[in-house]
Amino acid sequence: MAKRYGTTGEIVGKRVLLDKSTPKKPEAVKRLGKVRHCVFHPTQRRFVGFIVKRPDLLWMFRRKDVFVAYNGYDVVDGRIVVSQAPEATGKGACKAMGVNYDDCVLWAGLPVMGEDGTVYGTVGDVSFDPKTGEVRSLTVTQGATANALLGVREIPGHLIRGFKRGIGTALSVNGQDEGEEPILGAILVSDEVAELSRMAGTDFTGFAKTNRISMQ
């Protein structure tokens, strides 16, 4: 059975190989690059794949990044090995999953916000089902000092509403011209998160009160 990772923390920074096996060379691989970002569905609570940064050609010419589907690779001896199948990478992967790559979102570092406008921190590690990509939970970070005092909170998947445009921080968008009004985005969570935090003994009411913004 194919093995795949189940958290963004396990994937980002990993070296990636491309399967180049043939009947005569069943273990042949080629270096592809290193995982730069994890990518999520624009409207669903789902991990769809990751972006691999390729090494520059002759240390001078930048090569295009490669998008790999969440199910387009196996973990072999601790290394990510990307399948040769056309639906494993690029446009083929997006077509197979029914997503538009330019609409997809990078969750890492986005603010985590309640429906009432409370900002709980930013997205840290995200856990998901390796077989489907469905998000199981995410951790919220408030910076090293706050994390040391309060601990890193985990928000279960059923309380995560998903990505929401128009609130939060400015996004990096493909094709956006300089001078255009920035597009904002955040990860929206249920207001039940505040109660969950108090029950877990990691109440951060003071932090939340100073980080409440209008949702209008």
Enumerate the predicted regions with their spans.
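Peripheral interaction segments used for macromolecular assembly
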Residues: 1-216
